[in-house]
Structures are given as C-alpha cells and as structure tokens.
Amino acid sequence: MCMDKLGTYLSDHLSGSIVAIDLARRRASSQGNDEFGADLRRFAAEVERDQRTLRNVIASLDASPSMIKELMASGTAWVDSLRSAINLPGAPNLVRDLELLIIGVRGKELLWKALAEIGIETDPPIRELQDRATAQLESLDVLHNLAVEKEFGSGRAPSS
C-alpha cells in the first residue's frame, strides 16, 4: 500500500469535511429553525462524527493530516462566508450550497468504498459509514428539491 498517496487522499477528504461542516453550520444558522436549519444542524453533527473517524484512520496509519490543506479549507470557508455576509454578486444561495454538500457526501461515499477495497477497518464499521452517507444524500436531495421550489418557484417555465 502506498502510504504517501493514501495519506494525501485522506487529507484531501479531511479538508473537504472542514469546508462541509462550516458550510452546513453557516447555512443552518442563516435558516434558523425551519426544516432546512434543523436538518443541516443534524447533518453537520454527523459530518463531525465522520471527520473524527477519518482522523482516527489517519492516525492509525501513522499519517498526519496536512495542516496546509486544513488551513486552505478553513480559508475557503471563510471567503465563502464573507461573500455571503456582504452580499456580493454571485453570493451563495441555498440551492448551490446544498449541491456542494451533495457533491461532498458523494465523495465521502467513494472514500468509504475505497477504504473497504484496500482493507482499512474503521470504528464505526465502514458499512455503517456507507449507510450514513446514503441517508445523508437522501436527506440532502429532499432539501435540495424544497430549496429549488423555495428559491426559484414551483411553476413550469412558460412555453414559447
């Protein structure tokens, strides 16, 4: 097993989880106590658990997370939050943010699959992590559908 490549791969996913947690928390806070806020708070807590598992895997392989990548992930999250706060053109919207989270969870599914394929054991077991990722995707997909309706309207475009 090529530990350098695996360590880099795991650090990339760790960085992604930092951005996802920040994005989910920020979006949950801006949504308040509506269905989006509650579900995104729950999602952020689940991703934090997944992140702890990933950190444990990295430690068990005697690899170290990349501080540079973690700082870059935190910086990216900060810039994105700043864009939202000052309402710049192209500032994130709920639909886009949910799509980013969906992409991230799909990547996480592939991470767990890759670890299973190379025989890495996790606690909780990989099957449980895969099931949680699948449930997260289903939940985010429902939220995405609701957000599309909320942000863009529910009617069909007029025919020409």
Residue ranges and their predicted role:
Residues C2-Q31, L94-G119:
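Alpha-helical bundle segments that constitute or directly flank the non-heme di-iron/ferroxidase center
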Residues L6, G32, F36, S64-I68, ...:
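Residue-level recognition of alpha-helical structural elements
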Residues S29, N33-F36, L40-F43:
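Interfacial loop at the N-terminal end of multi-pass membrane proteins
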